[in-house]
């Protein structure tokens, strides 16, 4: 667990089950999960409100660890309330603008803000993610002014990817914190 920042875990549509790397990180590193009232029928307004409450409840600056739909949540949040966010680690950003890639219930998060984030960020993508084309994920990273890593063919980088606690991902997250001078 970092001592200079609070780390908030932001799952995407459907939440992250017990074998998802986000759940492992929460258990193993003491990070906090931002809970949503409805994981299966999200509304941008409700999710933004819950994220804002979670950020405001922290006594320190915050680093966000987002997966899938929650990456769009972070981009929207950055448009209005970024002051306590010190960085974001964005994994498998779902392309909520694509009917081919994303279910209807997630499209209420579009359009995806494509302006530079006001805090350092890093996007991690897979070369065969069914919810975002690899080049589109890199486009998001470039638009947001974020670093970018393609970890190869690991699907949606979730429990089905077979990564377990994904120690390589956590090492990359820690390296980002150090690079951002937050570790």
Segment roles from a protein language model:
Residues 2-60, 180:
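Active-site catalytic motif of lipid deacylating hydrolases and related acyltransferases
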Residues 32, 142-158:
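Catalytic histidine neighborhood in serine/cysteine hydrolases
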Residues 64-75:
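Gly/Ala-rich beta-loop-alpha elbow adjacent to hydrolase catalytic centers
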Residues 159-175:
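Post-His helix in hydrolase/transferase enzymes
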């Amino acid at each position: 667990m970092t001592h200079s920042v609070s780390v908030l875990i932001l799952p995407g549509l459907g939440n992250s089950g017990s074998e998802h790397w986000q759940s492992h990180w929460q258990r193993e590193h003491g990070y906090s999960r931002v809970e949503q009232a409805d994981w299966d029928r999200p509304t941008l307004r409700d999710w933004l409100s819950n994220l804002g409450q979670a950020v405001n409840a922290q006594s320190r600056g915050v680093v966000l660890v987002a997966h899938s739909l929650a990456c769009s949540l972070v981009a929207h949040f950055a448009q209005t309330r970024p002051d306590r966010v010190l960085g974001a680690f964005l994994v498998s950003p779902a392309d909520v603008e694509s009917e081919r890639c994303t279910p209807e219930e997630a499209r209420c998060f579009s359009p995806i803000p494509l302006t530079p984030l006001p805090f350092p960020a890093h996007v991690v993508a897979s070369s065969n993610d069914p919810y975002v084309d690899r080049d589109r994920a890199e486009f998001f990273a470039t638009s947001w002014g974020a670093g970018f890593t393609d970890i190869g063919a690991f699907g949606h980088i979730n429990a089905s990817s077979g990564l377990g606690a994904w120690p390589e991902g956590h090492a990359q997250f820690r390296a980002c914190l150090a690079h951002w001078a937050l570790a």
